[in-house]
Amino acid sequence: GLRYWKSQGSAALLGKVAAKVKTASTREIPYQKWIVRHLPSARELERQRREKFEFQPKISIVIPLYKTNEKYLRQLVDTIRNQTYPNWELCLSDGSGANSPIARILEALKASDERIKVVSHAEPLQISENTNAAIEIATGDYIAFADHDDELTPHALFECVKALNKNREIKVLYSDEDKMSMDGHKFFQPHFKPDYNP
């Protein structure tokens, strides 16, 4: 304060104040706290479920599978079923080959929801062939790509359709992505993508 100003002078005091202000303004909020603040509340998710868009495109979520861990597969499907936007179909291509370890679970998933489509292959497929096979069974207006160990936040498709309703000329949408702890309680390593700039 005053003692520092008397001993060091005005320029030194201003420099010290500026450094403190800069430090305070650039202090980062821990990401986990930030993401929790920005995820929609249960009330907001319910509001989204009731909202009826003028334009309601079907979104085909295509996923290539290869000997996928059953736990991750179920978690993925649960996050898709839990979407606040309901007009989707899930197109799964099992490229595991003969005696696929996930054949039974895929049949059960297909039987449980008419929006889930499955195609299986006798021979193992590379990821590009497997993805193309999933695209071939898609009937939606838009295609969304996901990996077999991904999860979607409940409002993911809602936000895409909201953007499409604001601008029907949109041909391609992309989103930010994040990593999540194995127990699903902690988010880390966000990848915030910039606005499209050709």
What is each of the regions a protein language model found here?
Residues 14-81:
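N-proximal low-complexity "stem/linker" segments adjacent to membrane-targeting elements
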Residues 63, 91-94, 173-176:
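Short beta-strand segments
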Residues 77-87, 166:
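Short, acidic, metal-binding catalytic loop of nucleotide-sugar glycosyltransferases
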Residues 86, 94-105, 123-124, 147:
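A conserved acidic beta->alpha catalytic loop
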Residues 121-138:
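Glycine-rich, basic loop-to-helix element that forms the pyrophosphate-binding segment
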Residues 143:
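Short aromatic/hydrophobic "clamp" motif used to bind/position activated sugar donors
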Residues 151, 155-187:
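Conserved donor NDP-sugar-binding/catalytic core segment of glycosyltransferases
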Residues 183-198:
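Short, flexible, basic/aromatic active-site loop/helix in glycosyltransferases
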